[in-house]
C-alpha cells in the first residue's frame, strides 16, 4: 500500500483493555467506520504470552484494514508484521534502532518511530522514519510510563523535522 502522509488524519492504536463489551475486531471496525486512517496493532498482553494468537489477531486486523483501504502497522514486531502482511511497524526508543528497522523492513513499508525530543526526531528522520509519534501532550491512563510533554516541546519537534 502506498503511504500518503497527507491522508494520515486519525491514527487508531489498539488496546484490548479498553474494548469493553466489544471484541477488538468490532472496536477496530468501529474506529475505521468513524474515520481512522491508520491502525496500529499494539497488544502488549499477546506479544510474548501467545505468539500464535497474536499472529491470528494480526491476520484478522490485516483483512479488516484492507477492507477499508487503511494501513496496518504492528507495534515493535517486524517478524509479525511480515508474517501477517502488515504495511509497516512502529518502534519506540527502547525497542529497535530505527535504522535497523528500516533495513529489515525495506523501503516500501511504513516505519513509525516514537520521538520525545528534537534529537530523537532528527535521528529517526535521518534513519528513514515515515512518521513520528510524539506525546503524550496530556496525561493518559492508556500508557503508564507516559510523561506529558509541553506544547512547546511538541512544537519544537515538529519544527525540527518539518522542513527536512
Provide a role label for each language-model segment.
Residues 1-88, 95-96, 103-130, 146-149, ...:
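Conserved N-terminal beta1-alpha1 strand-loop-helix module at the mouth
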Residues 96-99, 141:
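A short, polar/charged loop-to-alpha-helix boundary motif
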Amino acid at each position: 500500500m502506498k503511504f500518503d502522509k497527507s491522508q494520515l488524519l486519525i491514527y487508531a492504536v489498539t488496546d484490548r483493555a479498553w474494548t469493553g463489551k466489544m471484541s477488538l475486531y468490532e472496536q477496530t471496525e468501529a474506529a475505521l467506520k468513524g474515520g481512522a486512517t491508520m491502525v496500529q496493532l499494539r497488544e502488549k498482553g499477546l506479544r510474548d504470552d501467545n505468539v500464535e494468537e497474536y499472529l491470528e489477531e494480526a491476520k484478522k486486523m490485516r483483512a479488516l484494514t484492507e477492507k477499508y483501504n487503511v494501513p496496518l502497522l504492528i507495534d515493535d514486531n517486524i517478524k509479525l508484521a511480515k508474517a501477517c502482511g502488515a504495511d509497516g511497524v512502529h518502534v519506540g526508543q527502547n525497542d529497535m534502532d530505527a535504522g535497523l528497522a528500516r533495513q529489515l523492513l525495506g523501503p516500501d513499508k511504513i516505519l513509525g518511530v516514537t520521538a520525545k525530543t528534537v534529537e530523537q526526531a532528527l535521528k529517526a528522520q535521518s534513519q528513514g522514519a515515515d512518521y513520528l509519534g510524539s506525546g503524550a501532550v496530556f496525561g493518559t491512563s492508556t500508557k503508564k510510563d507516559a510523561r506529558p510533554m509541553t506544547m512547546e516541546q511538541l512544537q519544537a519537534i515538529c519544527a525540527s523535522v518539518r522542513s527536512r
